[in-house]
Amino acid sequence: MKLFATIGVLLVALLAFFVQPAQAEPDAEITHKVYFDIKQGEESLGKIVMGLYGDVVPKTVENFRALCTGETGKGYKGSKFHRVIKNFMIQGGDFTRGDGTGGESIYGRKFPDENFQLKHTKPYKLSMANAGRDTNGSQFFITTVVTSWLDGKHVVFGEVLEGQDIVDAIENAPTGARSNPKVDITIADAGEIPVEKSETKEAEPAKEDAKEPKEDVKKKGKSDKDEL
């Protein structure tokens, strides 16, 4: 009888250990808004408006914001989305080489991972591309599905507020062997938009039925020189 009681206690303890509540994400308020005007070849696709979480990752947000305005003499205007993978993400921000091997931050060529408090929990999240730990520069990506395997590896710092259809259009653009769009997709203009006080709460998920892509999609188009 004592043996069964002991086994029961152990089972309860194990269950309590494995069924612990997940640590909740901090409330992410939108502190800054920025935009991209997008062109595909000579055709205007429209505007993407993004909200940034400056209270959670202020250094990462300031880097992206300043590169949108170009106030430091360098920035995203004129650069292109060099890597597009359907059911995964769209990647840009390499304004020095344009192929995923360049880019630089406002702090120098690279800067450390600020924190990983925010997760890739839904489509249209804005996150830093990198080539490994503490190698953030200017390259970024926008998710088009849930990408939870990137949690703890890439710094989430914002989300798309308007222009999700533009992101979808970029995601579905024809691509070459290295996942680069066959027709250049460029950031024709970029800048900052004033934030109203009523806009400081994180936006609702844009796609309720989003699913994670299959494992083979996660590595498609990846090379040793690519940042993600």
UniProtKB/Swiss-Prot annotation:
Record EC number: 5.2.1.8
Signal peptide: 1-24
UniProt-annotated location(s): Endoplasmic reticulum lumen
Chief location bin: endoplasmic reticulum
PROSITE patterns according to UniProt: CSA_PPIASE_1, CSA_PPIASE_2, ER_TARGET
Residues bearing carbohydrate: 136
Keyword Membrane part of the UniProt annotation: no
Protein activity control: Inhibited by cyclosporin A (CsA).
Pfam families referenced in this protein's UniProt entry, alphabetically: Pro_isomerase
PPIase cyclophilin-type domain ranges (all copies): 35-192
Family the UniProt entry places it in: Belongs to the cyclophilin-type PPIase family. PPIase B subfamily.
Described function: PPIases accelerate the folding of proteins. It catalyzes the cis-trans isomerization of proline imidic peptide bonds in oligopeptides.
Protein name: Peptidyl-prolyl cis-trans isomerase B
Organism (species): Yarrowia lipolytica (strain CLIB 122 / E 150)
